[in-house]
A protein has these predicted regions:
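Active-site neighborhood of HAD-like aspartate-dependent phosphohydrolases
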Residues: 1-6, 11-45, 75
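An amphipathic alpha-helix signature
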Residues: 19-24, 62-70, 127
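Short, surface-exposed acidic
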Residues: 31-41, 75-88, 141-145
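A metal-dependent, Asp-based hydrolase signature
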Residues: 49-90
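Substrate-recognition element of Asp-dependent hydrolases with the DxDx(T/V) motif
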Residues: 87-88, 92-98, 105-137, 147-151
Length: 235
């Protein structure tokens, strides 16, 4: 049976929307959408760095959650202290309770489910927070709990080979029939490829392929619609 496993954040839904709403609620100085996009990209960059440090036990989860917006704001000379960063994170989490799937992703999940594909989730993050998002997106309509994997419960995070091997052994997967879909090149694409899986890069932020990349995605799409069309062609 073909198995298709999805990342969650910024793959199944637009993660930037919650960030935009949070900034517009809390920042006294109005920012344009483009300025918020730049702040969001900086926040994601620092989030990846600090998440890895948190996973290694070098900093606390709180320092990761507040540190990313503090570092991003510093880049743009926006004043913010730990108290305001805490409020930002709490508001951001609240806004994530309103997330919805990309419409084409919902259609894709319906198509794959009807075709009898085995569908799963692999997402990095803290268990409670990621579970909240999975519930908000109503992913249990297509993906059962036993096919849902959160790094915080496994003890390893992407791109470590161990997290992919864990799932492979748990589900007795055939590498040649297993596809992973994610937006993050290093964590999702390199992680899946070095484990021997096929990988589709959901590159809707239109990032450049790293020049030093030792692995390349099997397919690259730039929107949820392109992802849907890719699987419709295969049908």
């Amino acid at each position: 049976m073909d198995t298709i496993i999805f990342d969650v954040d910024d793959t199944l839904y637009d993660q930037a929307q919650s960030f935009h709403r949070t900034v517009k609620k809390l920042f006294q100085e109005p920012l344009s959408d483009e300025e918020i996009n730049q702040l969001y990209q900086a926040s994601r960059k620092y989030s990846e760095i600090l998440f890895d440090q948190s996973e290694a036990g070098e900093i606390t989860p709180f320092e990761w959650q507040t540190g990313r917006i503090k570092a991003a704001c510093k880049d743009f000379n926006i004043p913010i202290d730990t108290e305001k960063a805490t409020i930002f994170h709490e508001t951001y989490v609240t806004e994530q309770k309103n997330i919805t799937l990309f419409p084409e992703v919902e259609e894709l999940l319906n198509v794959l489910y009807k075709e009898g594909k085995q569908l799963g989730i692999l997402t990095n993050g803290e268990e409670k927070h990621q579970a909240m998002k999975i519930k908000q997106l109503h992913l249990s309509r297509w993906i059962p709990a036993e096919m849902t994997f959160i790094s915080g419960t496994i003890g390893h995070a992407k791109p470590k080979r161990e997290v992919f091997d864990f799932i492979e052994q748990k589900l007795d997967l055939d590498q040649t029939k297993t596809v992973y879909i994610g937006d993050h090149f290093e964590k999702d694409i390199i992680g899946a490829k070095q484990a021997g899986w096929q990988a589709i890069w959901m590159n809707h932020r239109k990032k450049d392929l790293p020049s030093h990349a030792t692995y390349k995605p099997d397919k690259e799409v730039h929107s949820a619609k392109e992802l849907l069309d890719l699987f419709k062609k295969k049908a």
